Amino acid sequence: MASTDSKDGTAATRPRRGRGDKAAAIAHAACEVFGRDGYTRASIDTIAAEAGASTRTLYNHFPGGKAELFRSVMQWSAGQVRDEQLVRLRKFLDPQRPPRPEDLERDLLALARAWVALMTDFRDHFALVRHIHSEAGHVPTEVLDAWQEAGPRQVSRELTVIMAALADHGLLDVHGDPAQATAHFMVLISAEIAQQSYWGVIPLPAEETDRLTAVGVQTFLRAYGAARRPR
């Protein structure tokens, strides 16, 4: 279960350590160790020590060892971020109540800024994501797939439905491929910020984050704005 105290941008992505709940203590420690050391360098001995558990106890809870533990932590953490992404998506883009054409850029920008802020709000999770990107060749494929399915793919599917609805309302021209429009939107609003901030490890100045996000939305609308539709 998640802690609701995210004042420092980290607690919201950590499992809560319940009294006597050794599995939660191990997961909590694993989240910190994987976020700090990455998948390859993290060791079962270190995780067990930080959890105050023996390696035997750890394997009793996670028989698959490091791979199973990493998958469990990533699925849980990705689920937390996914839920918050969907809350923010539905807040700013409701396909049942589409924005007026003149308000579309405003609403897309509000969504983009809310999503980019997740890198700060969920620092622990994005520390894990940063390590996944740098160590993808060493992380088991099933772990990568479980992470994608727990979070990014679900968000992408819901945004794709909304992109299609906006196109149906004449607000966007997705050129018959709302999934591709979704992929482009997500990259344009966040990729440069993620790269420059190392996935939120070194946050950019607020004004630079706002500028890059605005440029991303404007670039998206130049490619997919309904005004580009042939008449």
Predicted region positions:
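Hydrophobic/aromatic-rich alpha-helical bundle segments in the mid-to-C-terminal region
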Residues: 145-149, 153, 164-216, 228-231
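Hydrophobic alpha-helical connector segments
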Residues: 85-125, 178-182
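Amphipathic alpha-helical packing segments from all-alpha helical-bundle domains
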Residues: 82, 106, 120-133, 141-169
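Short, basic, alpha-helical segments at the C-terminal edge of helix-turn-helix-like DNA-binding modules
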Residues: 74-81, 87
